[in-house]
Amino acid sequence: MLVLGIESSCDETGLALYDTQRGLLAHALHSQIAMHREYGGVVPELASRDHIRRALPLLEEVMAQSGTHRDDIDAIAFTQGPGLAGALLVGASIANALALAWNKPTVGIHHLEGHLLSPLLVDEPPPFPFIALLVSGGHTQLMRVTDVGVYETLGETLDDAAGEAFDKTAKLIGLGYPGGPEVSKLAETGTPGAVVLPRPMLHSGDLDFSFSGLKTAVLTQMKKFEAAKLDGEALERAKADLARGFVDAAVDVLVAKSLAALKQTKLKRLVVAGGVGANRQLRAALSAAAAKRGFDVHYPDLALCTDNGAMIALAGALRLGRWPEQANADYAFTVKPRWDLASLAR
């Protein structure tokens, strides 16, 4: 089965072709980071308009890259939610217009399920079951994944997602957009232990997360720097140490909760997915823990940590392979800006 995947939930336009026999044939992505940078964040209307401009050139790119003709495609998968309503509507409209013109069925995909399954795109995918740490700008969850569509939420954030905390911390420190990569880069130049921040809910006894207090601690430190009248090189050094303290605290919590989930479920495989899964400090800490404690940890390729069409094409192929009745042949569709992943559980 050959599936075309279309991702447009936020500020990346992604298209890809995935074949159940041959794997990922082609994928193309356009990021809107440069466009949104001057506003300090995503502007939904601009995001929607840019998806319209980018989708068809990206389609031509993946078709040419893979040598695929439209007659070769069996189905079209698109991100149905969650995400920005306007952006979702663009992708859904393009998917269903192509499906109508080409006489193909469509299937709507949960954006987070795409992230959850994206580590299966590697050459040696992890077998089910596994624990998934889903960590992105909008979500932080620990899931027990038994099979496609068989998900159990073990823990989740009670307030800010980890990626959101990274972005807000970057803004407090005065870094550019997007904040997550910027604060991580700055943290690498900071001195470990120079600034020690709280580890929220580290000893809560459950698998839930909270990052709002960590963000507040960063704000408090910045006010201390201001009161001390730090400037110039001293201020830049203090900011680097603060960034290091923030990243160390966030990573400690994510690793500790992941280890607790593995212990609670007695599973030996951890899958990390979502944009924060590209963070080098997090990967290093989890890999070190895996080597010490004897479990396997799997990550998507760095290029597939961000939103992308490949994960949507994969999820569509896996769903249609198991449940052909999910194929939509009448081209009526809705989008779901708010959509709980747990509702997919079968």
Swiss-Prot record:
GO terms for molecular function: iron ion binding; N(6)-L-threonylcarbamoyladenine synthase activity. It catalyses: L-threonylcarbamoyladenylate + adenosine(37) in tRNA = N(6)-L-threonylcarbamoyladenosine(37) in tRNA + AMP + H(+). Fe cation binds at residues 111, 115, 307. The keyword Acyltransferase applies. CDD domains: ASKHA_NBD_TsaD_bac. Signal peptide: none annotated. The keyword Transferase applies. Its cofactor is Fe(2+). This is tRNA N6-adenosine threonylcarbamoyltransferase. The gene is tsaD.
